[in-house]
Regions:
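A long amphipathic alpha-helix within ATP-dependent nucleotide-binding catalytic cores
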Residues: 3-78
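C-terminal active-site "lid" helix and adjoining low-complexity regulatory extension at the edge
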Residues: 36-54, 64, 77-137
Length: 137
């Protein structure tokens, strides 16, 4: 199992998610495909992240907090407080691309084509869902 590791390069389980729905698309550990959680045996493809829209809104609001154009957000779902921001990463790991099954370059090119268009948090969330969601339903 991941032995409590939170980073993919250290052995954490990574689950690629559809940005539109929060449903699992695929999973990896140590860069290899994985279907079942190594500790619980649960089918990772059955995962649907609760509070998905709140998590996306929280992540999209980090732009104003940080002023950075590209960041990684680490979030947790607290039993009592719900979605919470754990940390921001100015240089997030890129191994999640393996779990997502697609690279970032096409997404970044789509964003670059926008130029200096200003969007509020809700518009950014909707843009990401519409352009980067993998339509799994």
């Amino acid at each position: 199992a991941s032995d409590g590791k939170a980073n993919l390069h250290q052995g954490a389980v990574g689950v690629g998610l559809c940005l539109r729905t929060g449903r699992a698309l695929r999973a990896v550990q140590f860069g290899n495909p994985l279907r079942h959680h190594p500790d619980t045996g649960l089918d990772l493809y059955d995962l649907k992240v609760p509070h998905w829209d709140t998590l996306l809104t929280l992540a999209a609001s980090c732009y104003e907090m940080s002023g950075l154009g590209y960041i990684g957000t680490d979030m947790v779902l607290d039993k009592f407080r719900g979605p919470m921001l754990l940390e921001l990463n100015a240089r997030p790991g890129l191994a999640i691309q393996i779990a997502n099954g697609r690279g970032l370059v096409p997404n970044l090119k789509t964003i670059e084509k926008l130029g200096q268009v200003k969007m509020n948090v809700e518009q950014r969330v909707n843009f990401a869902k519409d352009h980067f969601g993998i339509f799994d339903e």
